[in-house]
A protein has these predicted regions:
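A short glycine-rich, Lys/Arg-flanked "PGG" loop and its adjoining helix->strand segment in the class I
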Residues: 145-157
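Class I (Rossmann-like) S-adenosyl-L-methionine-dependent methyltransferase catalytic domain
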Residues: 1-38, 54-61, 70-119, 160-252
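Conserved class I S-adenosyl-L-methionine
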Residues: 44-53
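Short catalytic micro-motifs in class I SAM-dependent methyltransferases
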Residues: 134-135
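Helix-to-beta-strand junctions that scaffold the AdoMet/dcAdoMet cofactor pocket
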Residues: 66, 139-140, 155-156
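Conserved acidic residues
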Residues: 128
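A conserved beta-strand element that flanks and buttresses the S-adenosyl-L-methionine
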Residues: 131
Length: 252
């Protein structure tokens, strides 16, 4: 995008903003900075937003991705995708949105698609940069592994993937066991820990070592130590959730 062009500022109506918990503009700007500083995002890259919601990340990307860059996003929230198509794609024709009818007990209880079998609607090795913000924090193990497999499939060689998690490690375990964590991941289901055993997808945490092993299984390597979040009560943090940056290694 030309520097002299007017910056685009879009904010969805309040009833849609509630879907992502508010703070639409602030969180979008925060993660735009992380994508550049942590993810090394370039303005001419092809980007995939898994779980794009109501465009909270797409809106700031409108002012960063050039005409040589391309954005794709998909989500299970119909109204969010409709708003994005009507307000974002009409301004930037290199921004593409797709609705997917994936079942989620909390967000889409009537969905017809199984998240653990859903094939991303893109060709192999299509993307330079993929990001998932507050997506793996809602997926159970079978679903999560399938998504990692699909990410590895559609990511270009040497492409990067930026993911947020709730990671269980010695430090976060200390806060959890001491009752200091605002989020209580005390219910274990398979290889994960959930906040609400009756609605497990509401919030899901994973052992950091298990995530590292899973990523490596599909040829994704963590590029830096995780950037830990404040969710468990730690005082030194980057964001709210934990951030991991992975890269698809050329030779496995």
């Amino acid at each position: 995008m030309n520097e002299n062009e007017k910056k685009i500022t879009l904010i969805p109506p309040p009833e849609l903003v509630q879907y992502v918990g508010g703070h639409f503009e602030e969180v979008g700007k925060e993660f735009m900075q992380y994508f550049i500083e942590i993810g090394n995002l370039k303005s001419n890259e092809t980007v995939l937003d898994v779980g794009c919601g109501i465009g909270r990340m797409a809106v700031p990307l409108m002012n960063y991705l050039s005409d040589d860059g391309t954005y794709y996003g998909f989500d299970l929230f119909t109204k969010g995708i409709t708003w994005c198509k009507n307000n974002i794609s009409t301004c930037r024709n290199n921004f593409h949105f797709e609705h997917v009818d994936i079942y989620n007990q909390f967000y889409n209880p009537d969905g017809k698609e199984d998240a653990s079998q859903y094939k991303f609607p893109y060709e192999d090795e299509s993307f330079d940069f993929i990001f998932l913000t507050s997506v793996f924090t809602h997926l159970l193990p079978k679903e999560l592994e399938h998504y990692v497999r699909e990410i590895a499939r559609v990511l270009k060689k040497d492409g990067r993937c930026f993911i947020t998690f709730f990671l269980i490690n010695p430090e976060s375990s200390y806060y959890l066991n001491a009752g200091l964590s605002p989020l209580g991941f005390y219910h274990q289901i398979d290889n994960c820990y959930v906040l609400n055993k009756d609605i497990p997808n509401f919030a899901v945490a994973y052992l950091e070592e298990d995530i590292r092993t899973l990523l490596n299984k599909y040829g994704l390597e963590m590029q830096t130590p995780p950037h830990y979040g404040s969710w468990c009560g730690r005082t030194e943090h980057t964001s709210y959730q934990d951030i991991i940056l992975t890269q698809k290694i050329s030779e496995r």
